[in-house]
Regions:
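Structural preference for solvent-exposed beta-strand-turn elements
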Residues: 1-404
Length: 404
């Protein structure tokens, strides 16, 4: 194998696939990154057997070939190089990769590429290599920037507790004209739905995707060409899902990335049953102001289980003008009281929330104003952007019960 590429492009590709490298594994090859030079592209690949990522970058290939090298060493070395051309050559007999960039030279011991697990691909139509597995299934196209926003607004609500694997996933439902995502950790629920430009499925398809997989996809999409859709493939057995993303032109960019993920084999809870059907108090407040007030309150709430009391009250005479007051108390640090003007309909109410949960959802709302709907201090509250219906974006958060 003899191949050349730009340092910026290789660094970008390694940063993308590197997050899929197995942190701890009994298989040494899973701690490596695969480099495969072919068709004037350099494919980088990594997997932990749950998530697999392929990334293709532009390259000049003189001799085709492949090798796997330690991920951490390769990434740190490439990031230390100047932004110039990198020449790589493989000594097949010793499985050693020689790298040269400007006046920097290195030799890295690797493992045979044939030992590396095969990562499924969406395919380009000309695959003849027996080492390539083209994933078959239902193909769906999604608008790139809209998909990233959906992921950001939902995946944070998933659980990180591996003892509850079902809640570590995001339920993704493909309908003929609609895409819906939902995630919950048992204390909060985030549901986001969007219209599809054209139907890709005749019957609904619902799968449970690990939140970590969607999080990685969101990071990849941040550098993607938003003019091209993300292609999604769901296998007929509903055990794998693949996302294909196209990159931008220029230095420090990739040609395309494919993320393949195992699906969670479990039934997601019926979250619709916990969504409040009515409310007694409706509060409309400036999103940025509320987010800032919660962050200030959290400074005092950190020593008290992050509890922030939220009191809403309508204006004099029952008019819509009113206020929202946030209170946080620490036995050792003191207390904080923050007041904001708000449009309040209904009765006075005080309810306590986890400040972190409020910050998480408010940070993902772009709209200028947000709606908080509540019934009583012991019942869940709902948060959504003003102007978006409950069938578009809805966040439900359970109240806390601070000691009196």
């Amino acid at each position: 194998m003899r191949v050349s590429c730009l340092q910026e492009n290789l660094a970008k590709g390694l940063s993308i696939v590197g997050r899929a490298v197995a942190a701890r594994s009994t298989l040494p090859v899973l701690g490596n990154i695969l480099l495969e030079a072919k068709n004037n592209e350099l494919r980088l690949a990594a997997t932990n057997l749950e998530i697999g990522v392929n990334c293709w970058i532009g390259a000049k290939v003189e001799d085709e070939g492949a090798i796997t090298v330690p991920a951490r060493l390769l990434g740190e070395f490439v990031n230390s190089l100047p932004p110039e051309r990198i020449d790589m050559e493989l000594a097949v007999r010793t499985q050693t990769l020689h790298l040269r960039c400007a006046r920097y030279d290195a030799n890295m011991k690797g493992l045979d590429a044939s030992d590396f697990p095969i990562i499924p691909t969406a395919g380009t139509g000309d695959e003849m290599d027996e080492q390539v597995e083209v994933l078959e299934g239902t193909r769906i196209e999604l608008e790139t920037s809209g998909l990233r926003k959906m992921i950001d607004q939902v995946s944070f609500a998933a659980s990180t507790d591996e003892s509850r694997p079902t809640l570590t996933g995001v339920e993704v439902s493909f309908h003929p004209e609609r895409l819906t995502m939902a995630a919950t950790d048992g204390y909060r629920l985030s549901v986001r739905s969007a219209h599809l430009d054209r139907p890709f499925v005749q019957e609904p398809i619902t799968v449970l995707v690990p939140a970590r997989s969607l999080g990685e996809l969101g990071r990849i999409i941040a550098d993607a060409d938003t003019s091209k859709p993300v292609q999604v493939i769901v296998t007929q057995a509903r055990n794998q899902i693949l996302f294909q993303v196209w990159g931008k032109e220029g230095r420090g960019a990739f040609h395309r990335v494919e993320l393949a993920s195992q699906l969670i084999d479990a039934r997601f809870p019926d979250y619709r049953a916990i969504i409040p059907k009515t409310h007694t108090t409706r509060t409309v407040v400036d999103t940025a102001s509320l987010l800032k007030a919660v962050r200030v309150a959290q400074l005092f709430a950190r020593d008290n289980a992050n509890i922030v009391r939220v009191a809403v009250s309508p204006g004099n005479g029952g008019k819509q003008e009113g206020q929202i007051r946030l209170t946080a108390t620490s036995a050792e640090m003191g207390d904080s009281v923050n007041e904001l003007d708000a449009m309040v309909e209904g009765t006075d109410l005080e309810i306590a929330f986890d400040a972190r949960f409020l910050i998480d959802v408010l940070s993902q709302i772009d709209q200028a104003q947000v709606v908080l709907e509540t019934t009583q201090s012991t019942r869940p509250g709902t948060i959504r952007p003003l102007g978006m219906g409950e069938d578009e974006f809805l966040h439900v958060v359970m109240p806390m019960h601070p000691p009196r």
